Curated annotation (Swiss-Prot):
It comes from Bacillus cytotoxicus (strain DSM 22905 / CIP 110041 / 391-98 / NVH 391-98). Belongs to the bacterial CoaD family. It comes from the Bacteria. It catalyses: (R)-4'-phosphopantetheine + ATP + H(+) = 3'-dephospho-CoA + diphosphate. The gene is coaD. Pathway: Cofactor biosynthesis; coenzyme A biosynthesis; CoA from (R)-pantothenate: step 4/5. The keyword Magnesium applies. Reversibly transfers an adenylyl group from ATP to 4'-phosphopantetheine, yielding dephospho-CoA (dPCoA) and pyrophosphate. The record marks 18 as: Transition state stabilizer. Keywords: ATP-binding, Coenzyme A biosynthesis, Cytoplasm, Magnesium, Nucleotide-binding, Nucleotidyltransferase, Transferase. SUPFAM superfamilies: Nucleotidylyl transferase (SSF52374). Substrate binds at residues 10, 42, 74, 88. This is Phosphopantetheine adenylyltransferase.
Amino acid sequence: MTSIAISSGSFDPITLGHLDIIKRGAKVFDEVYVVVLNNSAKKPFFSVEERLELIREATKEIPNVKVDSHSGLLVEYAKMRNANAILRGLRAVSDFEYEMQITSMNRKLDENIETFFIMTNNQYSFLSSSIVKEVARYGGNVSGLVPSCVERALKDKFQTPLK
């Protein structure tokens, strides 16, 4: 049986922290779908299409990763892909309460889909897409925080020189 996992998020933009979780998940599962979810509570900086392209570029060296988007419930997407797992990254204890609520709801919707938590490497424990955008907005150096394709895309969006 093929093991299929879903790694979802807004990825606005994808960071090296996200990429770390994806790479580590890809070592455990036969296939990993990286899915951009449309979060109605967030106003996106990059369009869904831009995010998909950035993720494809960032994950092109990982052969068992596929990139997609979805606007419905994650559990429904997982069922559609015959996935048996959801991958979630945890940066700090503060992430756990929110993630536990989401996991409990997903389990209520489908008890056959397990959630696997992966602790972020310490070097990325502070990192979020919001922080990256804020630093880039003011022309700060985001290399070492995001893949190079994202660094270029941020520079283009903000019209700032790379530092």
